């Protein structure tokens, strides 16, 4: 009996020692950096495993990206993308109908404005990320900068993973939004949900914002994680299995370019246009051709063929 108990205890101890290896990985990304330095500095005072996403055209973008990097935090570009709903948009918001050159220009500008960025995630973007051809243009641009894409999943049928196929861009997906509600109790519920998903699936990504309520909850909870949960940077999950739940678009054709004459009113003719019949068309065409300079020239040449010049006639008669 005693040897059996010793074996059970030894097995339990082995499991306890191996638990860090089997720990669930939790990545937390805080979006919308660049507008509220006071709140954002509080986030930067937390463990460096928390990643931050900076809006590229925000007033403090470069400052906060540099601070985050110097504090050991991973920096992403929080790239504005067009939503389906009508709402105020950030400068340089990506839209599906933009050309590849325009999208590349915006991403290049964002990279310049947010130093030390290693990835990009979308700010809003339900319209953009659900458009396969628009996202293919995004992925082609990202590949040039060796950036990964964190899909914020603002719409169920996001095409990000499908669009990245054939490129070197790695895509990971958000699983939990921490603060759709800014009530602290609700944020705690979402934080615990992220922990449960990390435990169940091996890893998960939660996204929040530097709201005062979110900052307070993070300050309480990130220092009291369960022993089987490890806080990690978002990029450490790039090799974790990802499931593409999207469906291909029904009509897989690119968006038509914008018609520059759309909305322009055409003037109505004062008189009805007279019909042009075929016989009259050919008469006019024949007259036009016969009076052309080239035809007249050939006519003169043709009339002169076979006729000897006057000087030649005189010489011939003299001989």
Swiss-Prot record:
InterPro entries: Divergent_DAC (IPR006837), Glyco_hydro/deAcase_b/a-brl (IPR011330). One of its GO terms (biological process) is carbohydrate metabolic process. Pfam families: Polysacc_deac_2. Residues 1-23 form the signal peptide. It comes from the Bacteria. Gene3D superfamilies: Glycoside hydrolase/deacetylase (3.20.20.370). The keyword Signal applies. SUPFAM superfamilies: Glycoside hydrolase/deacetylase. The keyword Signal applies. Keywords: Signal. To H.influenzae HI_0755. This is Uncharacterized protein YibQ. It comes from Escherichia coli (strain K12).
């Amino acid at each position: 009996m005693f040897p059996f108990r010793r074996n059970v205890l030894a097995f339990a101890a082995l499991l306890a020692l191996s638990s860090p290896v089997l720990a669930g990985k939790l990545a937390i990304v805080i979006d919308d950096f660049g507008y509220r330095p006071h709140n954002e500095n509080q986030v930067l005072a937390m463990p460096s495993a928390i990643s931050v996403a900076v809006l590229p055209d925000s007033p403090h973008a470069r400052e906060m990206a540099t601070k985050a990097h110097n504090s050991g935090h991973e920096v992403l570009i929080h790239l504005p993308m067009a939503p389906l709903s009508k709402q105020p948009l950030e400068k340089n918001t990506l839209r599906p109908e933009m050309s590849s050159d325009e999208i590349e220009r915006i991403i290049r500008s964002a990279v310049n404005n947010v130093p030390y960025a290693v990835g990009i995630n979308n700010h809003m973007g339900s319209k953009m990320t659900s458009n396969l051809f628009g996202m293919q243009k995004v992925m082609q641009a990202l590949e040039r900068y060796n950036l990964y894409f964190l899909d914020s999943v603002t719409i169920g049928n996001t095409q990000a993973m499908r669009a990245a196929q054939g490129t070197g861009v790695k895509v990971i997906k958000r699983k939990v939004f921490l603060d759709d509600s800014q009530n602290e109790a609700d944020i705690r519920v979402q934080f615990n949900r992220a922990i449960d998903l990390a435990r169940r699936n091996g890893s998960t990504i939660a996204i929040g914002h530097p709201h005062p309520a979110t900052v307070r909850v993070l300050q309480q909870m990130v220092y009291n994680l369960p022993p089987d949960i490890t806080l990690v940077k978002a990029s450490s999950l790039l090799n974790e299995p990802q499931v593409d739940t999207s469906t291909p678009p029904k009509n897989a054709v690119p968006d038509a370019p914008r018609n520059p004459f759309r909305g322009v009113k055409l003037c109505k003719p004062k008189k009805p246009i007279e019909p042009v019949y075929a016989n009259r068309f050919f008469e006019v065409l024949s007259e036009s051709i016969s009076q052309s300079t080239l035809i007249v020239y050939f006519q003169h040449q043709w009339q002169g063929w076979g006729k000897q010049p006057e000087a030649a006639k005189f010489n011939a008669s003299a001989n």
